[in-house]
């Protein structure tokens, strides 16, 4: 997605060897016009697949997932990272390691929001090592629902997340694919959408 790549080049900041900071439009402050376009692009791609739910993980996946779900006219569910006393029965959980935060969290979704009839589109802000998507897949499959595809806003193609997910049989479609960081600049691979 050219608009996203241009925004990454303009406002993204490289930290170290493998971190891209995009807090001015995605991971802290949210550019709603960009998120609306991201949602439109994902929805256009998946409109004919019968998606019934969009699932993400808090926090930075919520904005692109909301706009995708809105464009598809289906509910969006986000997995919670913190235990909530109001979520006390029928909870589906998985362990997820965060590459950026370098911590493992138990993420959860109330089972009443997913059913075996659901066809789920996972949307997330970043794909690095695939652990967030893997955890969401475990939760979705605990409910007996089907993962149709995984939509990623920014993929770090130099890490193994895509390979892990595709080898497990899940299609991955990314709007921006980072090939590498070179001389303080992002070098892109051809995106899927």
From Swiss-Prot:
InterPro entries: PRibTrfase_dom, PRTase-like, Pur/Pyrimidine_PRTase, Xanthine_PRibTrfase. Its main location: cytoplasm. One of its GO terms (molecular function) is xanthine phosphoribosyltransferase activity. Xanthine binds at residues 20, 27, 156. Its EC number is 2.4.2.22. It catalyses: XMP + diphosphate = xanthine + 5-phospho-alpha-D-ribose 1-diphosphate. It comes from the Bacteria. It is found in: Cytoplasm. 5-phospho-alpha-D-ribose 1-diphosphate binds at residues 128-132. Pfam families: Pribosyltran. Belongs to the purine/pyrimidine phosphoribosyltransferase family. Xpt subfamily. Homodimer. Converts the preformed base xanthine, a product of nucleic acid breakdown, to xanthosine 5'-monophosphate (XMP), so it can be reused for RNA or DNA synthesis. This is Xanthine phosphoribosyltransferase. It comes from Streptococcus pneumoniae (strain P1031). The gene is xpt.
């Amino acid at each position: 997605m050219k608009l996203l790549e241009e925004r990454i080049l303009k406002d993204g900041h490289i930290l170290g060897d493998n971190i891209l900071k995009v807090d001015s439009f995605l991971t802290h402050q949210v550019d709603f016009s960009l998120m609306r376009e991201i949602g439109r692009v994902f929805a256009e791609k998946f409109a004919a697949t019968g998606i019934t739910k969009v699932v993400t993980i808090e926090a930075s996946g919520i904005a692109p997932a909301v706009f995708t779900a809105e464009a598809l006219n289906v509910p969006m569910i986000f997995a919670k990272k913190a235990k909530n006393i109001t979520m006390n029965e029928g909870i589906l959980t998985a362990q997820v390691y965060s590459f950026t935060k370098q911590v493992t969290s138990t993420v959860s979704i109330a089972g009443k929001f997913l059913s075996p009839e659901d066809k789920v589109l996972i949307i997330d802000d970043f794909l690095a090592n695939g652990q967030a998507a893997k955890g969401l897949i475990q939760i979705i499959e605990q409910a007996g629902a089907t993962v149709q595809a995984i939509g990623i806003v920014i993929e770090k193609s130099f890490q193994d997340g895509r390979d892990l997910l595709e080898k497990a049989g899940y299609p991955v479609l990314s709007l921006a694919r980072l090939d590498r960081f070179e001389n303080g600049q992002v070098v892109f691979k051809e995106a899927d959408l």
